[in-house]
Structures are given as C-alpha cells and as structure tokens.
Amino acid sequence: MKFFLNIFSMCTILSFLVVFEAIGNDLDQVICKAMKGMQSQEEKKIPYNIGDYELLRIAVDCEKKALITEKKHIQYSLSDFPQDFKINATKNWKKANCKNMIFNTNTGWSTTQIIKDTNKKVVLKLEANFEICSQ
C-alpha cells in the first residue's frame, strides 16, 4: 500500500508540474517524461516487498499512454484470496487513482495494475482512466 501511496503522491506532484510545464510543451510529452522519471527511480528497487506483495514490474508506454504495475502476493495462491477481494481492490484502486488529474481528465492516459498470486497467475487487473473515473 505504501508503494501505491508513494506513486499516487509522485503523480500528484508531477501533475502540478505538468500543468505548469504544459503551457509551453506538449502535454503528452510532459506526462511521458514525468512517468518515465518515476519508472526509472522505482525500477532500481525491483523486486521489493510492499506489505503482502512483491513488486515485479513497473512500465510506462508513452505511445499507449499507459502506466503499468505488476505485483504478486507473497503467500496467497488463487484460491486463497477472499471472495470480496475484487470488489475491495477495485474500489480502493479507483479511489486512489481517480484523484489524480492525469487519470481523471481526458488526457488519454491510464494506469493499470496486474495482481498475481504466489504462482504468478493473474488474480485481478485494475485500471483507472478518464472513462472509468468519470463513472
């Protein structure tokens, strides 16, 4: 959770920088540069533990305007996740990311998190973007 709050904080700060820099620059280039900077910093730490999870990957695809993170649970296999996991995780993901202007305005950017079990089987894929945040 700390990692995602860290990413959220960085994105919030970067979004303010984006607004000021975007006056003279193309917004997509500014967002891409900020995201790539964050990716570079976080990749130095991978793999590392975030509570019950291990961060496996962080990627920025500027062409697709996407931030992608991938993590796996340290102990749970697919059948060990609680039944309400998907509902709670989706609610928390949307709440955390839809506050960010990069994802709650029509920039075209999205953030995706892929959650895997201890065997690296996909448990859930979460996304936040303008369309999702507008609901």
Cite the ranges covered by each PLM segment.
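Classical Sec-dependent N-terminal signal peptides that target proteins to the secretory pathway
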Residues: 1-24
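Short, intrinsically disordered, charge-biased short linear motifs at domain edges
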Residues: 18, 82-88, 116-123
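N-terminal low-complexity, Pro/Thr/Ser-rich intrinsically disordered segments
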Residues: 22-36
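Polar/charged, Gly/Pro-rich intrinsically disordered segments
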Residues: 27-28, 39-67, 72-76, 103-135
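Short, non-transmembrane alpha-helical segments in secretory-pathway proteins
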Residues: 37-39, 92
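Short, non-transmembrane amphipathic alpha-helical segments
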Residues: 81-105
